[in-house]
Amino acid sequence: NLNIIAYNNLSVTHTGNVVETVVRSFQIPTTEINTNSVIEILAQFGSSGGAFTKTLRVYFNTSNTLVGATLIGTQQSSATQFYGGFRRQIVNKNSINTNRIIPSAAVQVTDITNLTVNMANLNWNFSGTTWLIATIQLGNAAASATLENIQVKLSKP
């Protein structure tokens, strides 16, 4: 049973400063998430100018702010031109608030390609309010990067 529970395909580009900047945020409807659900976050992120570092970060929080937010995953590139997919799976382990994930510090494009680290405890409580917050940070103000879309899928037994 697979459902898209949150989705936004409005492209948003960040340029002009090196400050981590929120480019997308929305509340995830958590009423369908159960004790053995798999929550999958997918996004497309890219850039077409400058060999500077561009970083996409995805967070969860109980409110629409970065203050106190939990980092879910990071994608980073210094290529002059790139376009890639971001993917993280969160696996609930017989509980709504005991879950596992590839460590958030892993900078690989997706958790499929990341074979060199162990799973980590996330322990996010999906019984409460959950905001997904996506940010872009540039290594140089002359760079630019675009979040093309982001979605949350839910798979449950």
Model-derived regions: residue spans:
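Surface-exposed molecular-recognition determinants
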Residues: 2-157
